[in-house]
């Protein structure tokens, strides 16, 4: 497709507020609230088949509407236990998301289907098919999918940065996430839901043998629900499966020159 056919648009409204307070020299807190709305649309016309001087075109239109509400609160305290300094961070998050997604297949006026065949030319002419008949493509007639999703995530996290000495820092922490999702297939009249409770640990070690040299190692885990990042669908098979868990291990050396 051309630049007028293959398009991507994004409209977003974001409102964010943050409140910070210093309780003492060793204690501070922060509360953040964000509300956003966005509309995103992908539309593409692409080659799905090729045979000599003929090319078969297919396409889709994929609009998404999403509303998010984020709430985050955390408290940071510095505590000394003898010669060891602890920087303890605790917090909570709440995320609510309403998502609507639609998927349209292309509809060609000559075939009444999502595909049409054209003669290869430069530039391509998509107004006349390979049989010489005038044709027109529509991106909003043939709906393939329509879904709405409701997502709620509640999280609690804690991290302790332990300054054992001037050249040794240890970090330990983790977070607990409760993830609830319900996906309604408007076109099929069905719905699927799932709830996941996951604990994700993290830890790290930084050793500084010299002022300009740091040796570090870290380990962390994260997870991705079976609904994916776009929350478009959750079939019966995916609803019965545990989320994907990712492990990340990093070891390195940092030199300040």
Name what the model sees in each region.
Residues 52-58, 134-137, 216, 228-230:
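Generic detector of short, locally flexible boundary/turn motifs and exposed helical patches
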Residues 15-38, 59-184:
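Face-selective signature of the C-terminal outer-membrane beta-barrel domain
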Residues 1-16, 56-72, 147-148, 186-195, ...:
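Outer-membrane beta-barrel proteins
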Residues 2-3, 16-19, 52, 91, ...:
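Glycine-centered flexibility motif
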Residues 66, 85-89, 93-97, 147-257:
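Structural signature of Gram-negative outer-membrane beta-barrels, strongest in the C-terminal barrel
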Residues 1, 45-54, 104-115, 186-195, ...:
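Flexible, surface-exposed loop regions and adjacent strand-edge segments
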Residues 1-10, 38-52, 179-181, 186:
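Periplasmic-side early beta-strands and strand-to-turn transitions of outer-membrane beta-barrels
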Residues 18-34, 38-44, 211-216, 242-257:
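Membrane-embedded beta-barrel scaffold of Gram-negative outer-membrane proteins
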């Amino acid at each position: 497709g051309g630049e007028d056919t293959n398009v991507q648009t994004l409209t977003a409204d974001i409102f964010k507020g943050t409140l910070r307070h210093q309780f003492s020299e060793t204690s501070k807190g922060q509360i953040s609230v964000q509300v956003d709305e966005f509309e995103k649309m992908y539309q593409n016309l692409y080659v799905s088949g090729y045979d000599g001087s003929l090319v078969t075109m297919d396409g889709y239109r994929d609009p998404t509407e999403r509303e998010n509400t984020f709430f985050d609160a955390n408290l940071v305290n510095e505590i000394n236990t003898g010669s060891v300094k602890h920087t303890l961070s605790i917090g909570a998050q709440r995320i609510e998301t309403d998502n609507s997604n639609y998927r349209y297949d292309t509809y060609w006026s000559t075939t009444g289907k999502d595909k049409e065949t054209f003669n290869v030319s430069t530039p391509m002419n998509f107004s006349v098919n390979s049989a010489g008949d005038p044709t027109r493509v529509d991106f909003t007639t043939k709906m393939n999918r329509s879904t709405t999703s409701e997502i709620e995530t509640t999280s609690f996290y804690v991290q302790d940065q332990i300054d054992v000495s001037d050249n040794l820092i240890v970090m330990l922490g983790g977070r607990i996430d409760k993830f609830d999702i319900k996906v309604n297939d408007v076109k099929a009249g069905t719905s699927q839901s799932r709830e996941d409770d996951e604990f994700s640990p993290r830890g790290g070690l930084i050793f500084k043998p010299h002022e300009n040299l740091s040796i570090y190692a870290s380990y962390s885990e994260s997870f991705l629900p079976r609904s994916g990042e776009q929350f478009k669908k959750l079939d019966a098979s995916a609803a019965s499966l545990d989320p994907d868990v990712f492990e990340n291990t990093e070891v390195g050396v940092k030199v300040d020159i």
